[in-house]
């Protein structure tokens, strides 16, 4: 509604200012789209009519080529710099290592010499004292008989203990005296425990040797004494000695730490010295020296001294080297607001003109949860950072993917340990015992094994479950006989389902965040295995719905297990053998059981033959119990495979609103509040400049910028409708960040894709068969090689995501990425969970950060739930994004959920469909708690097999659009050198989306995905830090400077670090000069960090003067019209909307008044134009013409006056023919006698004549005047003509020549709009004038 009022107001304003009267080509409706475009961009019309198109495109490409290629240029430059730095430092490191080795050897020699001197000194000082102490003991030992009784032996041992105690005291006292000796060097470097042991051992050995000379009878006893001295005295009293001896003296470990700290301090000193000087790497490449100059606040890396001399920067207000960091307290309710602002000032002091491009690199986040224990709070942040493991190489898309659980928080690890305990086995053990009691003949061994593992609580719980046995049997029987394959879930069926419902209650309304299911405080978070009865129900239902020879029993094993280890292989083989043995005992025709293992997702699939039915279901229970008894320690859950189907429909020709009963939504432009509203939406929207442009019809250069942008796009976009790409603003996203990056992989788990398609073969990647996939050759071919055997759903979805831009066919959202197509849907549009999990495992192995799932089921599959949960541990803990379609049944997913779209994980994103009218599609599912975002899904044109194209409709078409936008975001991150967190990518999509306001909330965010906003947000810092869109790229001319505002937010609780990189390129295209400015940034949001204090919200005050560099023109247009916003819906927009609404009403009211008055003036203008066109031939000028008109008026008035005596109250009509009118010519006198009654009557009765109808009332007063004038006579020959007097007889004869008819005989429909009604004598003259005008017409 606001949009319509806005457009109408602009049209009226233009109409009011438009003053020309006679313009027949004034078509206002043709400009409606132009006005409409100013408020919103619905349709982009590609224009081919541009003069000198070739030169225009070359200029445009040259102007923006660095913007597209800057990432590759920066990456190559960084790679080359590291190679040169490594090569140069390698030589320096070898020299330094040699020096260090020499120093270490010298230190070791000096230390060893010091040890020897100290030991010799102590040995000399203690030898005499120890001899005196040992003399008494030795005398007591040698006296008496050789054989001593036990009492004497104990007395001897006690004397030895006293001797040892006295010896320890002697050594300790000698060492304490030694420490006070000032002549000994490196006292703190000596290990006094080592000295104590060596001195004591030497003294004891020396004493033993002397005793051995005195007598050999006590040799064995002395050896035992020696061993006891070493093992007992030293070890038992080690703590006591260290407490007394080493009091105030550093230990060996502390000594080593001191050495490390000294070395690190030396390195810091050398680095500080280097930071103030120019570091030249003398290694050359093709472009010259690569120079690194470190300043106090930033670092410049370049291959030219010109950039060092010309460019200067002030980053003292933002760099962590100057301010340490920006401290912002974390607030969960306000983590999306950018509250702190700083500036970077860039100046050009040289003669050259440079092109500047901004980006960010090397982001790092440290989660401080669990790190700050009570003992660690005293440590500084630098010391705590040393405890965090450094991340591996950020290029994680190469190689084989694994699941990395190392980054689990303490809460998650504790919760995982709880899940791995006895809880998963409780339910199974209970049922196991029940079944053993009911089937003693068949299961004696199993009952004995399970009875040992049960406790009293399990037995009591078991008795309570016995009462539920018969109702469950009845329900299973009813479900089996039902026509639908869906089951009614019981209380003990799905613990997961209850957990999902509880997670919704914990979620905050209105936010798009998902709560992690691993909440240890949630009582329902215990993942209990499905019971055997439930598995039997699944088996029977699958048997009824799917006629297959085998059914897949999927067992999800613990994620930390290594399934390829010997232990796990033995466990799996034993379980298989026991199960085969049981089957062979009861089924003679049975051969063997096959199974499938998939890692790293860790699931085991056992193919159970379809030999069971309702008659022998007890045998199936026993088989499941046997399997559980062997694997229950390693299994998290198990269930039979479920069925999934795709979400698409054929082309529908009806209007979008036919079946749409939902409240209408309007497409509005969200507010933008960054940077003190300097570039806010309200200022632009209420600005009068566009109104002036409309009023004056100024065709400025800015009005053609969009045409320039669109003509730079792929040619195939002109061959079909691209409304879906237009409304999500993909074109500007391409213009800013390119078409994507080939290293980014999107895994399409669907019905496969046509390998030979022209639009896909450039991006489609088919994984070669490898043992890492753990598939048989046939199974692999089904999943990948034969993926073209499909009905087109997978090809259609794949084309939407990444159709190649090759001037043929269609173009995808991300035309330059890698697509991995995996088939799990068969030819009937259905697929099982076993194949789905297998496909997801292949995606993990290929390190795909994005997975598309345009399929689902209303049945909750615990195995798929666990599989999707483990996707957050891919890519070294970064996680993979799962984009899922919400469904096509117009249902509320909050009430009737569809999976996997409604899995409540932070890396799962549910997508609904939107139509061209910016309304949720009538077929699309919705849910204000479960559906996250909207995307185009109505009448989408894309690829199908055999190089054909087709229009499909459905949420299956909406999800690929979000996948494509996610791929563009990942591409920007990859270009900047890092891989983002999956949750952060989805938060970027949510916060940059376009708001769709409606009376009823249908999704979590009620917003449309915005490719341009997502790319810009990622390009300029993400959700932690943001720079304005205008500073992505700009030119810095001679003597100019640029103030770059940067805002910060507390997105998460922890410490975030990154580098703002400013790329510098000369405008001269032939130049190979390149440089980068690196500004380190740190944001601290954890208030528990020691000495945390919030930073000021505002930094330094800068003055912007006339030397400020201008924004780039094309980029400014993109930024001003971009629906790019990092905020949620702004309340200030309501005030602006109300003001605009009243202004529009006022404009409409003024316009209506003006148009009404204009209509009257236009009518008068046309009458005057007719008068001016009717000018008879004349010789004597304008005066004679006016005289003729006056004489004619008088003649007709006098002619009709006499006959009105008898018709005072009557209406009369007289018709005059065209020939009679032509007889009245200039310069002649009419002779009324020549008109006979017959001739006049013939002339009057001719039907083709135009008539003038005169209705005359109240002419009684004018009768005498009319007769008088007739008697007086008229002169038609001018001044020199004779006067002709008419007698009464001639006048009466003339009157008889005219026939009057009564007005009552005329029908009402004969009176036309041209009739003249004379109501009184006052307006007779006016009526006669109008009569004369019509008569001339």
Curated annotation (Swiss-Prot):
Q: Which domain of life is it from?
A: Eukaryota
Q: Name one GO cellular component term.
A: plasma membrane
Biased amino acid composition, Basic and acidic residues: 498-511
Please provide an example of a Pfam family that matches this protein in its UniProt record: Pro_sub2
| Keywords from the UniProt entry | Autocatalytic cleavage, Cell membrane, Cytoplasmic vesicle, Glycoprotein, Hydrolase, Membrane, Protease, Serine protease, Signal, Transmembrane, Transmembrane helix, Zymogen
Q: Which residues form the propeptide?
A: 19-682
Q: What is its main location?
A: membrane
Q: Which residues form the Peptidase S8 domain?
A: 722-1015
Q: Which GO terms describe its biological process?
A: proteolysis
Q: Which family does it belong to?
A: Belongs to the peptidase S8 family.
Protein name as it appears in the record: Subtilisin-like protease 2
Question: What is the scientific name of the source organism?
Answer: Plasmodium falciparum (isolate Palo Alto / Uganda)
